[in-house]
Amino acid sequence: AFILGRNMFGPIRGEWPDDAWKGWWGDNPPYHAPTFILTHHARAPIMMEGGTTFHFITNGIEAALAQAKAAAGDLDVKIGGGVLTVRQYLLAGAIDELHLAQSPVVLGRGESLFADIDLPGLGYRVTETVPTELATHIVLTR
C-alpha cells in the first residue's frame, strides 16, 4: 500500500470540482496497490487499471497509516511524498526506513525535507549509500 499527499495526486486545491481528475498517471498508475491520499476534502474511492485504488483520507496521517497497514497485510507501506507528507510521518516516528535519491540538479527553492528535523535525535542513521551515474541513493534507518 502507498500513502501520498494531495499534491502528489494532482494540482487541484480545495473542494473537488468534479470526479474528472484521476491523478497524474492516466488509467494505469504505477502503484498497483491500494493508495491512500491525504486530503481535507472527501471523495469516493477511484478504482484504476493495474490494481490501484485511490482512497481519500480526511482524518489525518494516523488514520491513513492504519488503513494502509490493514490493506498491505504483511507487505510494506510506502510513503510516496510529497515533502509535507514525509515530514509529518518522520516527526511522528512512523518511518522505519527512508530511501532518498539525490540528483545533482538545481530545481529552485522548493520545500525542505529536513528543515528543523533532528534525524539523529529521532534515531535515524545512514545505513547504505549507492552512487550511480544519475543519483546517489541514500538509505536512512531507524
What kind of feature is each model-predicted range?
Residues 1-142:
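Enzymes that bind and transform nitrogen-containing heteroaromatic metabolites
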